[in-house]
Regions:
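Catalytic core of the metallo-beta-lactamase
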Residues: 7-75, 96-107
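Short internal beta-strands
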Residues: 1-4
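Cap/insert and terminal regions of metallo-dependent hydrolase folds
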Residues: 62-141
């Protein structure tokens, strides 16, 4: 929808924060407070820690059968097809701080279920570490 010529997002029914009660008793949120729009990870305290990620953590080593030819070209150029990656589109458009992104390494987790890409089962924190500690193009200070 548009408001005064500017595109706006739909408004949520409920705004969540890190203290919000979630429907799973062992779930909590980690918010990236510097990104616009906000981004969050859902952390499940089981099986060594499971992170459910939106746009921030991705694991797409190669295109899937569901990507069109044009999507494959565009996404490859943007840096999407990499294993254990911090979402390049998210970094470029949401502009989180590098410290906020790197704070993921303070979490206890073994697995990542990304909304973009394949599940990372076992050793996920160590697998994402190089991307989280490396250059984060699009972050602000």
């Amino acid at each position: 929808p548009e408001k005064g010529g500017a595109v706006t997002y739909m408004e949520p029914d409920v705004w969540l924060n890190e203290q919000s009660a979630l429907p799973l008793p062992d779930a909590r949120l980690k918010l990236f407070t510097s990104s616009k729009p906000p981004e969050a990870l859902c952390i499940l305290a089981r099986e060594g820690g499971i992170v459910i990620a939106g746009d921030s953590l991705q694991h797409s080593p190669e295109p899937s059968e569901f990507h069109s030819f044009l999507a494959k070209l565009m996404m490859k150029r943007m840096g999407f097809f990499k294993p254990y990656n911090v979402g390049p589109g998210w970094l470029q458009f949401a502009h989180p701080t590098a410290d906020d992104v790197r704070s993921v390494l303070e979490l206890d987790f073994e697995h990542v279920l990304p909304c973009h890409g394949d599940a990372v089962i076992g050793g996920a924190k160590d697998k994402f570490r190089p991307a989280l500690e490396g250059e984060l193009k699009g972050c602000h200070t």
